[in-house]
Amino acid sequence: MQKAKTTAIVWFRNDLRVRDQQALTQATLKHNRVIGLFHIPETWLKETPWSFKKMEAFRAQFLLQTLTQLQEDLAKLNITLWVTVGNLKQTVQQLQEKYGVTDLYAQHEWTQEEIDDAAQIPNNIKTHWNYDQFLFHPDDIPMEVSNIPEVFTVFRKKCEKQSHVRPPIGIPDPMPTENLIHETPELPTLEKLGYENISNDARTAIPFDGGEAAAWKRIQEYFWDTKQLSFYKKTRNGLLGKKYSSKLSLWMAFGSISPRSIYAEVKKYEKTITKNESTYWLIFELIWRDYFKYISLKHGNKIFKIGGILGKSYEWKTNNRLVQKWIDGNTPEPFVNANMRELACTGFMSNRGRQNVASFFSKEWHLDWRIGAAYFEAMLIDYDVHSNYGNWMYNAGVGNDPRDRKFHISWQAERYDPNNTYQKTWLQTTLF
């Protein structure tokens, strides 16, 4: 393909990788100059009305690790990654004036803050959007987005029967060495972004770094070295350690690995090692992730409304004292407390824990579920807007749970932590 003598920006969003990266691949094929760009909005660094930042330190640290890796990987392709904090429009205009940018390639996002970001791109730059975060591409599902079923099982069965997963694409060929730009802003540090340095807690279930290389290292470890994928369905409700689940959500949240790549690795594993309920269940969870993305694509800003996608009215409270007790792990439920303290100390919590603390927050204390969702957004390293708000709506009874269940938390603790090992790990104070 003959390249146009033009300059394109690849605006990285939650797709921070070089392998199976549509925007990057398209830009490098069509333009003789390509610049990478990542923008950190100032809103991420500011406090919410509930006294925590929109992005707290654990997620910020993982993001910076991810950007460091991406910068190195792009440099191998002779592409510069320009990381900017603050005014996106001004940065793009500066790049346009200095390098004659004509085109911009990016992953399409449809939630409100991301729409507002996209509106800052100057009108005289041609934009190329792609749907690069799905397992099942929107063009390949057997229904219109407006007709996405409100029950997950219906969606899953239709997609499994009538759709397909596109094969992942490789890493693009390197650009000429003259494509590199040597005068670029330095990557910010945690301190420059306004955070204190954090240290890893020895009890963490996620002793991992951010970035594409770390994502593939985890695939190698969890799939091929230990073959823990073969037992995923049996262990996935665990609470302690790195082995009980894949933890791939960490890297998927930043797009350091694509769902298509994970799917392809599972299929390879099924051909060469074993195919069982556990290997299927990892794919099942990828479909859940897709489903919440489609639900938000269908319903738009309803996912941020107090009545959720159902428009249900409950008497929600905004009691700051109770919210703080929940955040501090100081509720009447030890199982909730242990999970909240793990989150505060590590930026992570198991899926089982998330469901229980969300159910307690919304169904026992009847607090505005959106405050809980905002706290998860701040704290969870693997925060994904669609899964986070989809799951919170589900647990609060305003989303996709047709039975509107609530968790019996003491029973959950007895079942999943029968010897109190998890609760002792996070609640027992050290004696000196």
Locations of the language-model features?
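Specificity-determining recognition surfaces
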Residues: 111, 115-250
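Trp/Phe/Arg-rich N-terminal binding region typifying the photolyase-homology
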Residues: 1-167, 341-342, 387-391
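Short loop/turn segments at secondary-structure transitions that flank enzyme active sites
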Residues: 40-43, 110, 133, 158, ...
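C-terminal catalytic domain of photolyase/cryptochrome flavoproteins
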Residues: 2-4, 25, 199-206, 213-216, ...
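Short acidic/polar alpha-helix capping motifs at helix-coil junctions
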Residues: 55-60, 84, 210-213, 303-306
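Secondary-structure junction/capping motif
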Residues: 15, 56, 87, 111, ...
